């Protein structure tokens, strides 16, 4: 039986952002762009599902991953219709998973987000935080700044 050469189906494989490599904070350096999830919904009146946002964004991003589908491997700037060179991005982009926040009180979850973002800042890596609700903004910005926020 021949080996399958088609891209992985969306539901197969390790679910990472755009099928990027999985990493830990200890693996990061200034060249890396880290994707990090904060699945939390403590700041909304009723549980509305914002804690599922990091997973949903990863699931959707698989359609646009470098290895997911050859037709999306070379994105085009639609305003000027020129190809965008993403060849360097694949080596830089890593997914470090979600901050474990489930079941934590709001104050403890905020501290966990702040501590994780502080560790990311110390690694000098750039980061994209995929959220839950808007309560992730203040601890993320506070940890990323060098003074009071």
Model-derived segments and spans:
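Metal-dependent C-N hydrolase catalytic cores
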Residues: 2-149
């Amino acid at each position: 039986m021949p080996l399958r050469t088609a891209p992985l189906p969306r539901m197969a494989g390790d679910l990472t952002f755009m099928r990027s490599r999985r990493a830990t904070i200890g693996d990061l350096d200034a060249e890396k762009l880290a994707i990090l999830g904060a699945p939390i919904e403590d700041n909304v009146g009723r549980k509305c599902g914002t804690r599922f946002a990091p997973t949903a964004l990863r699931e959707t991003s698989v359609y646009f991953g470098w290895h997911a589908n050859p037709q999306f491997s070379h994105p085009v700037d639609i305003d000027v219709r020129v190809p965008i060179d993403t060849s360097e991005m694949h080596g830089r982009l890593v997914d470090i998973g979600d901050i474990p926040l489930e079941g934590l009180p709001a104050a403890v979850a905020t501290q966990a987000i702040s501590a994780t973002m502080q560790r990311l800042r110390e690694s000098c890596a750039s980061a994209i935080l995929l959220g839950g609700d808007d309560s992730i903004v203040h601890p993320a910005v506070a940890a990323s700044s060098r003074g009071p926020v």
